[in-house]
Amino acid sequence: MITIPALTLADLLLPMRWTVWGIALATVVFIARQARHVAPQVRRTSAALVAVTAVLLPLLPTPGAALQQGIRIGSLIASLLVTINLLSRAAARVPRVRDLLEKLYHVPPSRRYGVISLASQFFGGLLGLAGIAMMMETAARQKNLSYQDKLSSFSAVTRGYAALSLWSPMYSNMSIVLAMYEGAHWAGVLPVALAVTALFLVLGITLDKLFGSHRHARVQASAVSATELVREGWPVLLGMFGFLSFMVLTSRGLGLPISAVIIATAPAAAWLLNAHLHGGIAAYGMATRQLTLDMSSFRGMSGEVMMFMASGCAGTVIGSAIPAAWTAAIGAAVAGSPALACLTISSVIVLMSAGALHPMLSAVIVGASLDPAQLGLPVLAHLTAVLVGWGLAIIVTPFSVVSALASRWSGIPVFMISFGANAVFVLLALGTSASMLGLLVRLMAA
């Protein structure tokens, strides 16, 4: 499995044809060796996507370029997933991190949603999906939560995920979308992404204040104050922020994609953290053995790797195969209104994902077929609209990993924890974010 991130890193640093086909070969070998770990449903879905790719590929004017882009997208997601998981596993072993997560759910009920939403930006934004899973696992251990309080807490985590997926480089969302736009950089997207993130957080807190049945609940004697939470958690948050700052500065200083910096440094950071936890003379040897053990457990990720690679290739090929007349008609209908164009991009991604299509596949298809020129949008607004649709699609569709995790840990049916809990939020988020991006486009043009 380590070969795929290594070749992906080489391709990010020095993109060449041999690195792409090396990634493809390494992926095929890995999946073939670990095929017994792949669920039958994943095999069937991936086979269907490969079949669609094979049928459409000969019809494209540049089939090789489309296939190479799909391979790069799939390998980038797999590489980020593996390397960030090494770091998050090491972080989960830190006692202070576990204690801080536990105290998040002892905040007074009227403030709990906002605190959890904000905390998700740190744990999820800097530890990846494993950080989100850690927050859900901790919520599941809280036996004193009513059904409505539990629904509110898990909604705070999932909506926080939708918000952080707009800005965090730890997720494939940002990395994949940047790979679709030549010349786009994370630092250039960050200000707008953070503005929409803040919008999502405020919107979620407002909805919880208005409709949360817990808003008049009594404060328990053991409730944790915000001051105590900050006092206990600042070393953890400072460490997370320090690592993110290091990656950003390294990326800007060396002129490298931030995805390359993450893939290269996350395993090293995990090794150092494991060494710190063990302490003593034998710490470095123990850290190496722990890192090797964590890496060996990733053989069970063959299903995810298969799905990512199949979705990446199918998304770019399908997007390239959609007739230009169709996309031109859509572009002509919405090009006069930047807000309507952004709303169209995000809404189509959400609707496609609600129809059981993988959110990543939906985002790649829409981003590749409805390009900025057709819709009359700057790249920044178009890119952000794709991110908005992708993030919201993940939390409203019952078919995503986040929805499945939330249902498993909460015990709430998956349809209720996804569509039932987030439908109103997603509708409002689509409208308000499109209005914000439309205003941004008009200000940029002024």
Question: Which residues make up each language-model segment?
Answer:
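Hydrophobic mid-bilayer segments of alpha-helices in multi-pass membrane transport proteins
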Residues: 2, 17-58, 77-84, 237-242, ...
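Core transmembrane alpha-helical segments of multi-pass membrane transporters/permeases
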Residues: 62-94, 117-121, 286-323
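Membrane-interfacial loop-to-helix junctions in multi-pass transporters
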Residues: 76, 102-115, 146-153, 301-304, ...
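Helix-loop-helix module between adjacent transmembrane segments
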Residues: 118-127, 156-166, 315-316, 349-355, ...
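Transmembrane helical segments that form the transport core of multi-pass membrane transport proteins
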Residues: 243-362
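Juxtamembrane boundary at the C-terminal end of a transmembrane helix
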Residues: 434-446
